[in-house]
């Protein structure tokens, strides 16, 4: 589960120098429309300084695109509104506590696991379990040097703003939070318990994801996702598969357009039979994975 949530929150990139980026696939696809191209990039939400620059083929896809599309419209994000939205969706307002929602046995297990990785669970007393899980995950990622300000979305947002390229969103922040807040409480408990219990092994788990993402190794990414989501079918359906189907429907309408698009979403959404590339291929669109050295054809 930690690898699954890491993929959702992180999907990190490896490689400390340009030479390390050559001669391998990248988690990037080109779809040939009737009159245009659409690129699908597996998103890296948080990065470290040493993970830059991005592979050259990603830069070329960005340069080729007229429109940048992300899970949410990043150039329209209001930090004050976003914080308020998180508070509305995930902060308990009626006197109920995280301990109440977890139950005595699960909360005891969570407290012991949190203490083992030096996480002060008391500070999350007013959080719903899903928000507590994401908060813990981000705290652990920050500890090992990952930063959303260095991630692909922020990098692309800054470039698009400088270049005057429009950014569009597939969803809104409220929609994304509704997916999480609507999860059954049992699934939320499991999210938090798994993140805490596997937190000590996060560096190794992330290392595997980084290596797979860096080499465009979709088989390994898919295996990590599937093995981590065993027994969490409802969670996977709500947060991944149902969204993939909606996105594939939307993207298919852009494949008869005069504009070229670069679509940046979590790599979790681009692997396997239920991934967006596979869904679009089933609709009859030509699609292929791109590689370094940088070439779009």
Report the location of each language-model feature.
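Sec-dependent N-terminal signal peptides
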Residues: 4-13
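N-terminal signal peptide c-region/cleavage motif recognized by signal peptidases
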Residues: 14-18
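Structured, acidic catalytic/metal-binding patches in enzyme active sites
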Residues: 20, 27-239
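Alpha-helical scaffolding within the catalytic cores
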Residues: 23-26, 247
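A cross-kingdom marker for long, charged
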Residues: 233-297
């Amino acid at each position: 589960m930690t690898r699954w949530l890491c993929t959702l929150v992180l999907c990190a990139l490896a490689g400390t120098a340009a030479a390390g980026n050559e001669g391998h696939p990248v988690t990037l696809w080109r779809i040939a429309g009737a009159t245009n191209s659409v690129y699908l990039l597996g998103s890296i939400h948080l990065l470290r300084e040493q993970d830059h620059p991005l592979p050259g083929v990603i830069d070329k896809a960005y340069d080729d695109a007229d429109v940048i599309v992300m899970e949410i419209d990043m150039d329209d994000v209001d930090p004050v509104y976003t914080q308020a939205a998180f508070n509305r969706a995930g902060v308990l307002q009626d006197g109920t506590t995280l301990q109440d929602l977890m139950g005595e046995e699960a909360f005891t297990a969570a407290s012991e696991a949190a203490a083992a990785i030096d996480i002060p669970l008391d500070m999350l007393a007013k959080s719903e379990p899903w928000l507590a899980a994401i908060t813990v995950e981000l705290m652990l990622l920050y500890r090992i040097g990952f930063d959303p300000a260095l991630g692909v979305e922020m990098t692309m947002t800054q470039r698009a703003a400088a270049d005057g390229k429009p950014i569009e969103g597939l969803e809104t922040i409220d929609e994304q939070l509704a997916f999480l807040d609507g999860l059954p409480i049992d699934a939320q408990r499991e999210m938090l318990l798994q993140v805490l219990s596997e937190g000590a092994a996060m560096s190794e788990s992330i290392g595997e994801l980084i290596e797979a993402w860096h080499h465009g190794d979709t088989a390994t990414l898919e295996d990590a996702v599937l093995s981590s989501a065993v027994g969490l079918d409802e969670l996977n359906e709500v947060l991944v598969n149902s969204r993939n189907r909606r996105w594939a429907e939307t993207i298919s309408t852009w494949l008869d357009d005069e504009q070229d698009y670069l679509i940046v979403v979590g790599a979790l959404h681009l692997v396997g039979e239920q991934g967006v590339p596979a869904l679009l291929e089933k609709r009859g669109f030509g699609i292929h994975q791109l590689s370094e050295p940088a070439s779009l054809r």
